[in-house]
Amino acid sequence: SVVEEMKLTFENPWTLVAHVKEKGKSGYVSFNDTNLYFDRKGTALFESKKTFTGVPYVEGLSFDASKVEIGKKIPVEDDSAFTLIAEASKYLVKYSLTPDKLVYANEQSVVLYFGSVEALIGNKEYEIRIAQIKPILEKLKEQYPDQAGVLHLENYEADSASINFTPQS
């Protein structure tokens, strides 16, 4: 179910008001020729051919498709995957960023793709790392349009003086 919470109240004897809170979509994976959306805990929410704006496409999750059930946790090999994906998704929403895809490489690495730019964000400090992406992408687009490359944020800390960008030819 995509409903996280529902509250019904009577506004007056003839009016019932329903307050519905939907579960947030942390990402989606390709599944049986559709998109399978999941929440921050890895619960399969629903399948759809539709792609929702602001929800990242996720690669790198290993699971047995025959064991997936809507409303149940997706049976992935690495349970920490959803924690990292949910954490990254939270800050992508906060900073109004939608990557073309999010790749869960392993428990040590999440990689975001924005066009031809690959952003390595590691597995911690997501807020300060993701906060840097939008201004950097804008600067790259302005100074080096269409330049493919790797943005190294995996070791970036709040007191870091610089961020490396490795262009690809």
Each PLM stretch: what is its role?
Residues 2-169:
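Charged, solvent-exposed interaction patches on well-folded alpha/beta domains
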